[in-house]
Amino acid sequence: MRGDEYIAKILKDEGVSWLSCFPSNPMIEALSKEGIRPIAFRHERGAVMAADGYARVSDRKHIGVVAMQSQAGAENSAGGLAQANADNIPILVLPGGNPLNMLFVRPNYFAVNSWTNVSRHAEFITGPAETGNVMRRAFHR
């Protein structure tokens, strides 16, 4: 099973029914195949704010999930992520990523490094074998 398929299955098992997204992330297709409805936005911050709003109106009983492209897409989401974190709103942000051989090559944007200060938790998934543990920490921290 590929990493995106594994993440999609975990999200389905956690009760996620929809995904706010900005196009160009392989997670969108994988989640759609699991029956999780993607709702596309025109800007990454808007997608994050929709996930934030969903978690707020559910009184934090549901987690908002967002997917976007890597690099500038992940960077554009930081403001919305910081706001959700400041208000203790549970959202899960799934940016696209660089190939492992390009992971720390400049000028690539490193979402984990940047998001450490504006989120409760930020972590790389570098292979399918660690996906379950990383997702467990994301949902149950």
Model-assigned labels for residue ranges:
Residues 1-141:
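N-terminal alpha/beta PP-like core and its mobile active-site loop of ThDP/TPP-dependent enzymes
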